[in-house]
A protein has these predicted regions:
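Boundary/entry segment of secreted carbohydrate-active catalytic domains
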Residues: 1-20, 26-30, 159-160, 164-175, ...
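The substrate-binding groove and active-site-proximal loops of carbohydrate-active enzymes
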Residues: 6-12, 29-35, 100, 171-191, ...
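Catalytic domains of carbohydrate-active enzymes, especially glycoside hydrolases
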Residues: 9, 15-52, 196-213, 326, ...
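Hydrophobic targeting/anchoring helices
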Residues: 44, 64-65, 197-198, 208-215, ...
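Polysaccharide-binding and catalytic clefts of secreted carbohydrate-active enzymes
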Residues: 70-328, 346, 432
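Extracellular ligand-binding/catalytic regions of CAZymes and related secreted enzymes
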Residues: 221-224, 405-438, 479, 558, ...
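Short helix-loop-beta junction
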Residues: 462-487
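A glycine-rich, often tryptophan-bearing local segment used as a flexible ligand/cofactor-contacting loop or short
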Residues: 518-594, 599
């Protein structure tokens, strides 16, 4: 019997008590929560619904932060580059930074915890040659070397929590005191925070789920002097520091800390940077220490008979759900924001929790819910995009956040979400507890491996960037594809030379010398031979962009013999190239009419003589294939996410694995329609991913087929 209620969480506030009850009934919600900027109405305590309470571990206690300024959370900042044109150089530290957000830390020994670097030579400037003038806010360097560039790396206190500041700016909150971020890792604040949590639980006995936001360090988010976002890294660790923590780190690793281990020439160790040993050591240290303290808080929540839920975002740095330390924390649940399929897999794939919940978009904020806004459109795109991923890796609950009052002003939106809630319940009932049919085992190979599973090519959460959408499309396509997907690192291969035998196809996607492509790892003899042996013995390798690319021993693409292509960087202009004939009548392109969208593509890619070019534009190869021993290689210049490109990737995986004969199993001839089978449950579904009706032929697991007409966005369930 189809469930009409449950698995849905809605927001509430003091001014929408009756409306909350109405929406609970209409959407079939069984849980209510508060949000940043709202309060939970006491009148709703006894509705029978599960009650979530958002709990901020690092803010909303300014009295404590002001009384203990030495334990305010800190972050590392690097000044801009300055060229010396005289014998003295002054660098103003707060240039182009929001003055109310950060405060320079002069309390701790700046000669140890700051660093002035000559960026022309890479040398550290001795502390005897610079000082900080508190009156001007400048670091004064003298003597300097003329026309050398210098930077200053320094510590600053976070005087306005970046998330609170963002919410205040977006919602135009007036007369709101900036919330100071305090450092829960430090001794006084640690003791206070544990006691503060107990007080909260004592006074909120009606709460069923404590929704931690989060444990305990904010991802890197900095605003400029105009309150605009200046720098963001959703995975950034630079705001997880303090001398107290760094001294512990030094003791554990046995070598002195340098600010440069975090600053990384100004790149702040973003996910495109190949991580240094020191930064990986720091991350491992942070994971262990954050997990220990998070477990203490979770244990307290359990002591009170309540569930502990973590919001995956905001102050989440160090939690790393795909790493071993996470399991020790004992969380009951994880909730994450759903921006697309890949962001859903970021938390739906998490193990060692009882359930996961997706907070869907749009958030009920005025940036969407205003006159002329179209929240229904945003909701449809969000749901249909995420649904592909849910069908591969189901979450157990869905929910929404923000100001319910705003959503109620859009009755069409209310009606659409009612339909989504019911569709989700039906979907969950049909697929719970079962691994969907997977046609092949695919490994995405990069420097980060499982720690950044599904986070490849993500700078800020689900935000488009012109420079990476052509690569992120691969990850998004995989999030809803019928493959068993793993994320592995080069270090994993070094640790286990037989690792690749577990997979049918390996994918390497990204620009040269980034962490996604691999850089110098590709000149490591163990790695290059392991990958070539894997393909030679029958495996598939798909390279996208500048795969396996690093200039070495006469090659830029180190797997040119596998992929059949090389990039012209000027060094091969003397060699004539004659292989330009296209062969579009290929298995990979069988569903494509017209051109393939390669996004930004790649310039100056040419094919080796024995390579089969599928598509080239103006003598620049965009897609090519090649055999290598018993295996096969596929090169693609870029592949933005679309339903058609998802089909191209699907066929590329099958072809590279020499599995063309497995195409017509749980398959739709129309690439706008997909089939997902749950063999152990004896069910399968056919889903229309578009906003238009579609016709297709559906193939079942035994190869039999039937024609099908589908309405817009429709999902149909069948017994096997």
């Amino acid at each position: 019997m189809e469930q009409k209620k449950g698995r849905v969480t809605i927001p509430t506030n003091l001014d929408v008590v009756k409306e909350t009850l109405d929406i609970m009934n209409e959407w079939g919600a069984d849980a209510i929560r508060d949000c940043d900027g709202t309060e939970f109405p006491q009148e709703l305590k006894d509705t029978g619904a599960k009650i979530y309470a958002t709990y901020y571990t690092t803010r909303k206690d300014n009295a404590w932060a002001k009384a203990n300024p030495d334990e305010i959370q800190q972050m590392y900042i690097m000044s801009s580059f300055h060229t010396a044109t005289s014998d003295k150089l002054e660098i103003h530290l707060m240039d182009h930074l929001y003055p109310d957000m950060l405060k320079v830390n002069t309390r701790d020994d700046i000669t140890k915890w700051w660093e002035v670097i000559d960026r022309t030579t890479g040398e550290v400037v001795p502390a005897s040659q610079w000082h900080y003038d508190e009156t001007s806010g400048n670091v004064v360097i003298t003597p300097v070397k003329l026309f050398h560039e210098y930077t200053v790396s320094f510590l600053a206190y976070i005087m306005w929590d970046p998330v609170h500041m963002y919410n205040a700016v977006v919602n135009d909150w007036k007369d709101v005191e900036p919330q100071i971020t305090f450092d829960v890792r430090q001794p006084k604040t640690r003791a206070h925070s544990l006691e503060r949590l107990r007080r909260f639980l004592d006074t909120h006995q009606y709460v069923d789920v404590v929704r931690f936001t989060t444990f305990f360090h904010q991802f890197t988010l900095i605003f400029d002097e105009l309150a605009r976002e200046k720098y963001v890294d959703w995975f950034g660790y630079s705001a997880s520091v303090s001398p107290y923590v760094l001294k512990q780190f030094e003791k554990e690793v046995g070598y002195p800390f340098r600010p440069e281990y975090i600053i990384d020439q100004g790149y702040m160790n973003n996910t495109y940077r190949i991580p240094s040993k020191e930064f990986k050591d720091f991350q491992a240290f942070q994971r262990r220490e954050v997990a220990k303290l998070a477990k203490e808080m979770v244990d307290i929540v359990h002591e009170y008979g309540k569930e502990a839920m973590m919001f995956m975002g905001d102050h989440w740095i160090g939690m790393e759900p795909f790493m071993d330390e996470f399991a020790s924390i004992g969380l009951d649940a994880v909730v994450g924001s759903v921006g697309n399929g890949a962001t859903l897999r970021l938390f739906s794939d998490i193990k060692n929790v009882k359930y996961t919940e997706g907070r869907f978009l749009p958030y009920f904020f005025p940036d969407t819910f205003h006159e002329g806004g179209d929240p229904v459109k945003e909701a449809k795109v969000n749901w249909v995009t995420a649904r592909r991923a849910i069908l591969r890796s189901p979450i157990q609950r869905i929910g929404y956040g923000g100001y319910l009052k705003l959503a109620l002003q859009f009755p069409d939106f209310v009606q659409y979400i009612k339909e989504v809630c019911q569709e989700f319940r039906t979907l969950y009932d049909n697929i719970q507890g079962v691994t969907p049919y997977c046609v092949k085992r695919v490994a995405v190979l990069n420097c980060w491996g499982r720690m950044r599973s599904w986070g490849n090519h993500m700078v800020h959460h689900a935000i488009y960037y012109k420079q990476n959408y052509s690569y992120f499309g691969i990850i998004e396509a995989l999030s809803g594809a019928p493959f068993d997907v793993s994320f592995i690192s080069f270090d994993d291969i070094l640790a286990d030379k037989d690792l690749l035998k577990k997979f049918d196809v390996v994918i390497n996607v990204g620009d040269a010398d980034t962490a996604q492509s691999g850089g110098e790892y590709w000149v490591n003899e163990t790695i290059i031979t392991a990958v070539k042996e894997f393909v030679y013995n029958g495996g598939g390798f798909i390279g996208v962009g500048e795969p396996a690319a690093h200039q070495w021993q006469g090659k830029f693409f180190q797997l040119d013999d596998v992929l059949g292509v090389e990039e012209e960087r000027g060094f091969n202009l003397n060699t004539d190239k004659y292989n330009w004939e296209e062969h579009r009548d290929h298995f990979i392109l069988a569903d494509v009419e017209g051109d393939v969208d390669f996004g930004e593509g790649k310039k100056n890619i040419f094919a080796l003589p024995e390579t089969r070019i599928l598509i080239q534009n103006d003598h620049e190869v965009q897609m090519a294939v090649k055999t290598f021993g018993k295996g096969r290689g596929v090169y693609i210049s870029g592949l933005p996410y679309s339903f058609r490109n998802s089909r191209v990737l699907y066929r590329a995986v099958l072809w590279s694995a020499s599995a063309e004969d497995e195409l017509n199993r749980w398959y739709s001839t129309n690439y706008n329609v997909e089939v997902h089978a749950y063999v152990k449950n004896g069910k399968y579904c056919v889903v229309n991913n578009t906003y238009e009706s579609q016709d297709t032929v559906v193939y079942k697991g035994d190869g039999s087929s039937f024609p099908l007409h589908m309405d817009a966005n429709e999902i149909k369930w069948y017994q096997i």
